[in-house]
């Protein structure tokens, strides 16, 4: 399970060091793709494959489904962390997410998200009130 918030730096070659606690789960390979809210999503390869198959099973006659599948597949990049736990983020992914040197990696239960640190701070500020008001509705049984 992927949980927590981490602040690795992006180096000049576009490499990002994954949090040590997630490396074993991602050692078999991972997929980086566009995520929600201009973040990047990082899935274990098997999890991504299962989600992609499910998305592809949706009727291809639906224009929205076709667009989603095309964007998902076109933006996916298979990676295998190097010996130091680093992955190289493509220029297209870095641009999409607006990544600077300062990044934030957050656990989202079954995948990771990579954010630019300033964008993550702004997102948290924007959504804090909504999180507080929805807490009881969505987490009532959890709390």
Curated annotation (Swiss-Prot):
The keyword Secreted is assigned to this record: no
InterPro entries: MraZ, MraZ_C, MraZ_dom, MraZ_N, MraZ_sf, SpoVT-AbrB_dom, SpoVT-AbrB_sf
Places the protein is found: Cytoplasm, Nucleoid
Main location, first listed in the record: cytoplasm
Keywords: Cytoplasm, DNA-binding, Repeat, Transcription, Transcription regulation
Keyword DNA-binding: yes
Oligomeric form and interacting partners: Forms oligomers.
Protein name per the record: Transcriptional regulator MraZ
Source organism of the structure: Corynebacterium diphtheriae (strain ATCC 700971 / NCTC 13129 / Biotype gravis)
